Amino acid sequence: MSLVYMNIMTAFAVSLTGLLMYRSHLMSSLLCLEGMMLSLFIMATLMILNSHFTLASMMPIILLVFAACEAALGLSLLVMVSNTYGTDYVQNLNLLQC
């Protein structure tokens, strides 16, 4: 396994660890999710380029589209929670349930 793949997997693991450890603020959770999506995008792109599997070349683009939608929804939720409660604590999201 090359050093590039090891670095990308390490970046994914660090982002996942950050998501599991720093769950108190919504902004830090969103940043960790974006790090995970970026490392998945780079890993998928490199695997498709190295395997010369051109039929799956749209898969990283679709992953990037879903990452952009996730970021937009996350930021809108962050703005709504911070305007309503004044903080971006994840514990405030339990108050949004009906």
UniProtKB/Swiss-Prot annotation:
Subcellular compartments: Mitochondrion inner membrane
EC code(s) of this entry: 7.1.1.2
Keyword Ion transport: no
Reactions that this protein is recorded to catalyse: a ubiquinone + NADH + 5 H(+)(in) = a ubiquinol + NAD(+) + 4 H(+)(out)
Record-linked InterPro entries: NADH_UbQ_OxRdtase_chain4L/K (IPR001133), NUOK/Mnh_C1-like (IPR039428)
Top enzyme class: translocase
GO cellular component, one term: mitochondrial inner membrane
Function recorded in the entry: Core subunit of the mitochondrial membrane respiratory chain NADH dehydrogenase (Complex I) which catalyzes electron transfer from NADH through the respiratory chain, using ubiquinone as an electron acceptor. Part of the enzyme membrane arm which is embedded in the lipid bilayer and involved in proton translocation.
Protein name: NADH-ubiquinone oxidoreductase chain 4L
Species assigned in the record: Capra hircus
